[in-house]
Amino acid sequence: MGPLTFRDVAIEFSLKEWQCLDTAQRNLYRNVMLENYRNLVFLGITVSKPDLITCLEQGKEAWSMKRHEIMVAKPTVMCSHFAQDLWPEQNIKDSFQKVTLKRYGKCRHENLPLRKGCESMDECKMHKGGCNGLNQCLTATQSKIFQCDKYVKVAHKFSNSNRHEIRHTKKKPFKCTKCGKSFGMISCLTEHSRIHTRVNFYKCEECGKAFNWSSTLTKHKRIHTGEKPYKCEECGKAFNQSSNLIKHKKIHTGEKPYKCEECGKTFNRFSTLTTHKIIHTGEKPYKCKECGKAFNRSSTLTTHRKIHTGEKPYKCEECGKAFKQSSNLTTHKIIHTGEKPYKCKKCGKAFNQSAHLTTHEVIHTGEKPYKCEKCGKAFNHFSHLTTHKIIHTGEKPYKCKECGKAFKHSSTLTKHKIIHTGEKPYKCKECEKAFNQSSKLTEHKKIHTGEKPYECEKCGKAFNQSSNLTRHKKSHTEEKPYKCEECGKGFKWPSTLTIHKIIHTGEKPYKCEECGKAFNQSSKLTKHKKIHTGEKPYTCEECGKAFNQSSNLTKHKRIHTGEKPYKCEECDKAFKWSSVLTKHKIIHTGEKLQI
């Protein structure tokens, strides 16, 4: 095989032929020429850049009116033959066949006149009248590269059988010199190499972002246009990528074909299984250059980096709130629509996020696969284990820029920030009351519905919040696991300990704008404000008396019911209120009440 020139891998058109091509076909020509040139360079064949390539890279018209021919480089000789021992001929064929046949095979220009090279392809009976002119010309390039002439058909068969064989044997003879990753075909290695070279040929006119592939640019443009051409027939939801629609459909079918060999858990996406496997290995390959923190997912690292930059590019058109991630914006939008598309098959409860449904489903199974290595405590969600681990480390990585206060969780920091802004985006449709947290709105709604789904197994008392049930349970055990380091006093709940600590510091960060009075708890400030507004939203259904606090209404109701939940352990006497029980106990202790 003799020395090659760039002309050997270029396609030539006459002026008449060039004028027959439409814009799409001319762009196709440009892509093929650039692709062929890059493949030759990547294969290690040194060549000075032809005028044609320079012209195409600059986006200029390839036809020269003076010369009346396509600007093909002068016969620059490649510095060497294709070295058969370094680059097996068969795989070189694979590379160019992928470019010329597979990727550019459907141009549909029926009456394009052909030059000699294409006629020779007809002699080989490669295209029995079914292919169009431009495709034939592209295939002619391949003929020139491999010097097949009349045996191109045989070369195709051999190439395809070899490629088929590689799939079954899983041989990966082509190795990336940059990162060591191996591939079965040289075309795949060529595509992969762009990751290292960062060669971006397709630029977005809207934002300037560049991409290696025109198809990737096309997908990216949909971010700006908002186009969502792929629609789910089941629920009508639309997507900007077909792959996202395929993933979404599995929600309706419940299909989970990907199984973890370690624990047997199944997933509806292969990527989710891959992510899950890292739980078993403990591997954290993605490290933050800013603070050194490591993560098991690249997406988590990307999200984490925004802590350092403060970037929030995704804005809600409804209320103006900005988010670091597009997924968070999507989740947030459901607040405005009230939509709950994710339904539990066991109990029928609906959720606005698939993650919330997954969290809920564990209630029915009772499964707790995530165990803490420090104390052995098990959790039903990996996120809960992560949250729990901070108890052992004491780490508080999330700091408020406004006041310097640090928090263990980003969600707690987000909630805290609202103290400074005073924002209350969550409004009750029933009574128009607004809240700074969606969870508080959910809790509040139960006042109107009267729903109390959380029941104590000991005494049968029901609560509208799970946290209230947890607190109540401790009244049966008298357990006080949270101890003050300053005075040694024990508390049943960490929140009570936090409130107690302020006694020692004297801090009162919550100030009334009306009268200037300061409080050590936000709840006390909220209660105090009602003095100025005169608001009494809690009304007794029995007698119509109104109260400014729900706790006062609860106490008042006991007058009508006769309920006496506070019992003296010493003499079994019962009382309506805990304060009266406290006073009563002094009779038994002999302690003198301080007035």
Swiss-Prot record:
Subcellular location: Nucleus
One GO CC term on file: nucleus
ZnF locations on chain (C2H2-type): 146-168, 174-196, 202-224, 230-252, 258-280, 286-308, 314-336, 342-364, 370-392, 398-420, 426-448, 454-476, 482-504, 510-532, 538-560, 566-588
Tissue: Widely expressed, including in testis.
GO molecular function terms listed in the Swiss-Prot or TrEMBL record: DNA-binding transcription factor activity, RNA polymerase II-specific; DNA-binding transcription repressor activity, RNA polymerase II-specific; RNA polymerase II cis-regulatory region sequence-specific DNA binding; zinc ion binding
The entry's keywords: DNA-binding, Metal-binding, Nucleus, Repeat, Repressor, Transcription, Transcription regulation, Zinc, Zinc-finger
SMART domains assigned: KRAB, ZnF_C2H2
GO biological process, any: regulation of DNA-templated transcription
Entry-linked Pfam families: KRAB (PF01352), zf-C2H2 (PF00096)
SUPFAM superfamilies: beta-beta-alpha zinc fingers, KRAB domain (Kruppel-associated box)
Residue ranges of every copy of the KRAB domain listed in the record: 4-75
Stated role: May be a transcriptional repressor.
The family this protein is said to belong to: Belongs to the krueppel C2H2-type zinc-finger protein family.
Name of the protein in question: Zinc finger protein 85
Organism field: Homo sapiens
Lineage: Eukaryota, Metazoa, Chordata, Craniata, Vertebrata
Encoding gene (name): ZNF85
